[in-house]
Swiss-Prot record:
Pathway: Pigment biosynthesis. NADP(+) binds at residues 27, 73, 100, 133, 164, 168, 199. This is Short chain dehydrogenase claC. Keywords: NADP, Oxidoreductase. Non-reducing polyketide synthase; part of the gene cluster that mediates the biosynthesis of the bianthraquinone cladofulvin, a conidial pigment not required for virulence but that plays a role in fitness and resistance to environmental stresses including UV light and low-temperature stress. The pathway begins with the synthesis of atrochrysone thioester by the polyketide synthase (PKS) claG. The atrochrysone carboxyl ACP thioesterase claF then breaks the thioester bond and releases the atrochrysone carboxylic acid from claG. The keyword Oxidoreductase applies. It holds the Pfam family adh_short_C2. SUPFAM superfamilies: NAD(P)-binding Rossmann-fold domains (SSF51735). Belongs to the short-chain dehydrogenases/reductases (SDR) family. The keyword Oxidoreductase applies. It is an enzyme of class 1 (oxidoreductase). Induction: Expression is positively regulated by the transcriptional regulator wor1. Expression is down-regulated during biotrophic growth within tomato leaves. The expression is induced at later stages of infection when conidiophores emerge from the plant and produce conidia. It comes from Passalora fulva. GO terms for molecular function: oxidoreductase activity, acting on CH-OH group of donors.
Amino acid sequence: MAVVNGNYIPGRLDGRVAVVTGSGRGIGAAIAVHLGRLGANIVVNYANSALDAQKVVDQIKGAGSEAIAIKADIRDVSQIMRLFDEAVAHFGHVDIAVSNSGVVSFGHLKDVTEEEFDRVFSLNTRGQFFVAREAYRHLSEGGRIIMTSSNTSKDFSVPRHSLYSGSKGAVDSFVRIFSKDCGDKKITVNGVAPGGTVTDMFHDVSHHYIPDGEKYTAEQRQQMAAFASPLHRNGFPEDIANVVGFLASKEGEWINGKVINLDGGAA
């Protein structure tokens, strides 16, 4: 919320600080940039590419907000703790935490290894749990925690997608219970559950979502995916970012403990 020249401007986040995990590219980058455009100062978290993260920082600064990039592997709890400590050390406080880091996985039940199970759940589930824990410990009163689920967690069943879907189903439960645990600090906890969203990862895995998907080009698969929604268009990172921006705002306060499907009605 913001007051400019004595006038209240709905939806603005001026004076707020947001930590967005996994925001060097894709949906996370779109969220970080959008929150920056709404006036928040942003901590861009990344695990691998400092160059990609710096591009996001530059976009946010170009929009008039401050931003820094902090490298931290969300699979490592000590690095999550350091991420939030450094965010507070730099900006003085944190008001919004968007838990976006994740990996995708496909495999028939008979073929899934222990190593693959641990790879997926260590980030999608365990990582998000401890991001939320550190967010609660560091967030100012009245803050926002926004987690990332998927429409495959319950409404959209995809063969050979059990690890990913299950890892996100746990997040749905986290959101519901965390909203109770965080009430003493007036922190709301919600989740977004994207459907197929056009990013580089989408093009890498879209053949898994479409029967005989290997027969089609990436462009053809994207066109086919658009018809999963009655709106007959694809979802894009900005579609997710717009909802996250609302949940982070004062106007989103009465939404709490909810996971919002963002799939254009595909499910």
